[in-house]
Amino acid sequence: LKDVATVSDGFEDTDQALRFDGEPAAIIRVSRVGDQDILKITAEVNRYLETAPGGLPEGVTLTVWNDNSRLLRDRLSTLLDSARQGFLMVLILLALFLRPRLAFWVSIGVPVAFLGALYLTNYLGLSIDGISLFGFILVLGIMVDDAIVVGENVFAEQRKSRTLLEGAVLGTQKISVPVIFGVLTTICAFVPMLQGVGTSGQIGAVIATVVICCLIFSLIESQLILPAHLGHQDVKTEAGEIYLLMVPVVGILLLEFAWDVSSYIGLAVGMVSLMTLLHAFSLSQGVATRLVRSQERFSERVEVFINSHFRRLVAQAVSARYTTLAFAFAFFLSGVGVVLSGRLPFSFFPPLASDQAIAQLTMPLGTSAAVTADAVLYLEQSAEALAEELSEQFPDAPPVTHILSAVGNQPSSRGGAGPSGPGGGSSGGGHLGEVTLQLTPSQARTLDTRTIANLWRDQAGSIPGAVELKFNSSLFTVGNAIDIQLSGENVGELREIAAALRLKLSSYPGVIDITDSFRSGKQELKLSMKPEGDAAGLSLAQLAIQVRQAFYGEEAQRIQRGRDDVRVMVRYTDSERRSVGALDRMRVRTPAGSEIPFTTVAEAELGRGYASINRTDARRVVNVTADVDRSVITAEEVLSDLSGGYLNDLLNDHPRVALSLEGEQRQSGEYLVSLVFPFLIALFVIYALLAIPLHSYTQPLMIMSVIPFAYVGAIWGHQIMKQFDLVAGLAMMSILGMIAAAGVVVNSSLILTYTVNRLVSEGESLDNAVVNAAVTRCRPIILTSLTTFVGLMPLMFNTSVQAQFLVPMAVSLAFGVTFATVITLLVVPAIYRVFEDIGGLIAGPRSPAVATESSV
């Protein structure tokens, strides 16, 4: 073979290159398979890295570039901290309002329900991750509601000189119907979240599944287990009560100090032994007595306030019931006004800051890898300059730790899903490039990732000849913030409109990374036959095959070398295929076996095709996309302004072109539509569940009238938290929180209305019954609201990246329930009397006794 050809043994031609901190590099990606544990895989890799450097050639180092398990560990750590803090705050709150012994047994229901829910969620195929863990935190304050109501009622019955067991049974029976149906209505409020579509739908479904499982086991615990504890366990001394309460407190605090399961067990045994000794020798009796007396004084003052000041307030609200409703309606309008005024912008899925800032470069298709490499080098140098500036500003913790640059590929892209670490990659090409900055964890730096990306964008400026240069700082997105799809038959017309739309978008401050999906293809040679070629018996297909064999090559065979297949390619030498002129010198074989010059039988015309042809419903489409700096403007504001006239005028001038919103806007619309029908069904089921225990068709409507006020409370909650830069506005997770709040607030109203009906049936007048019911149920209703709020407080005030997208849902639920509590205690009694007034007008004059009986 050497007599007729040159044989070279080498690697396949490629345009791809990689540099890590300025040095040539290669990436090894380790991925999990099936249900493998990412934390265990990471531990194994780290153990290997501790011993691997000894066997590497000189000058070769191993560095962990993108550890996705760190994100999971940070998220789990953040949410576990929020869970511990929330549970501790709930426990303290219970101890303030209830006896320590009662607070202990109510709080014990939380881990019992969690254990049951963990078993059930595992059976349903869920795993412990950041989303499912948020579901446990979300339900933390909710699932003690039924236990609080049952426990408080049992405690009240036991104080009436009954035995512990009799008080536990009677207290549970009296309140079991509204408690059971209240939990069922709460579950119904979460069911629509199971039906959502897209990324948000998947997140909402996981959260809803966890919450529903927890509520089921919480109901079982409050109706069967809690009464058994309260009916048989009596603590004779104050020290014994405090000892019981300190068990969960110590258990939570030890979680902060234990480094593994064994250390936790050891510390727990030690602390329990110490507490037992203190209790046995009565060393803690004095402190315990003072604590119990303080709690009793606080509880007595709360009772005095409820029976005096609050009673008068409720009586006045019922007496001036139409004025009360007017104030409630004004409050409702205030929330609507906040949204309509634009002071609380809506964003479907606010971007989550990553610990990477990425610049993605796209040159015209066909650009040589050398030209792209120069542009990537420029981006890399601008990144190094920025890193140096930031290290001077923050010498103690430089924000930039590593710089990775790639030519011929964009390794962070996975179908546009955002930064995910090299290795997945988009399809390669010499016209593609990317530079990635690895940043220190968000909690360890002052500047957020978007600010660093914006500084880098300003530092780099524009790249001459670049088709697209995007700077990305988000962990993931559900689509482009602005994505306008144009469809039509005329490609030239679509390009003209796309150019005009890009120019219009550039006039908005804060709109960045504007581009469209139209891409010219590579330069190509279009072959055509001459009459001489036809006369020689050549076809265009035969000609194309010979040109491909000469310049790309023909695979002659494959040779097995170890684990690799080595392809043997036959083609012209490098010098004979470097230029277009080489084609003119090529010899073409005819069917007769002779060889004639290419220029004799064919000609080649230089031109460009399309990089890709996109069609929707058989029509050509071009997408105009852009990102927004949400600190300046939102995508909704831009699109609202465009829809106000510009887009209509554009379509009127081009009647054959259609327009649609894609990306984040389409995801938002589809998700909202997917929730509407399930939510309406859930409302109907809630109405039915309320009508069953109340034996009324109108009283469920009265109870459900508090739902809009929960939404208004959530809106004002976002407005308040926005002042502290904890939320930017409303988001899709805010909507999910509002849906969840609907079921929780209905629970409290049901218990209140059920109590009114019971008091009326026992012979009280209607006016006295509504006031006495509000006074009787005031403490448990306030306590259930406060436990929900304080259980979510650590998460609401969490500023870490891991909790960013969860905060809006927590804000909606916490503030929605809190504001609706006031409505429940003051407005629901007034609404009850208004319904009776309306019923009296419809039925006509009746005796008071008959009216009272029919109202029940």
Listing of model-derived features with the role each one plays in the protein:
Residues I175, K236-G286, S294-S347, T852-V856:
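Signature of alpha-helical transmembrane segments and their immediate interfacial
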Residues L88-L96, P100-A156, Q195, C213, ...:
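Hydrophobic transmembrane alpha-helices and their membrane-interface caps
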Residues V4, V45, R75, V90, ...:
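Residue-level signature of catalytic and energy-coupling elements of molecular machines
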Residues W65, L72, L76, G151, ...:
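Helix-loop junctions and hydrophobic alpha-helical segments within the transmembrane domains
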Residues M193-Q202, L255-Y264, V287-A288, L325, ...:
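Transmembrane helices with small-residue packing motifs
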Residues F20, R73-M89, G669-L683, V811:
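N-terminal membrane-entry
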Residues L224-H229, K236, N798-S855:
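Hydrophobic alpha-helical transmembrane segments of membrane transport and translocation systems
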Residues L1-D13, P24, Q36, K40-L62, ...:
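Surface-exposed amphipathic alpha-helical segments in non-transmembrane regions
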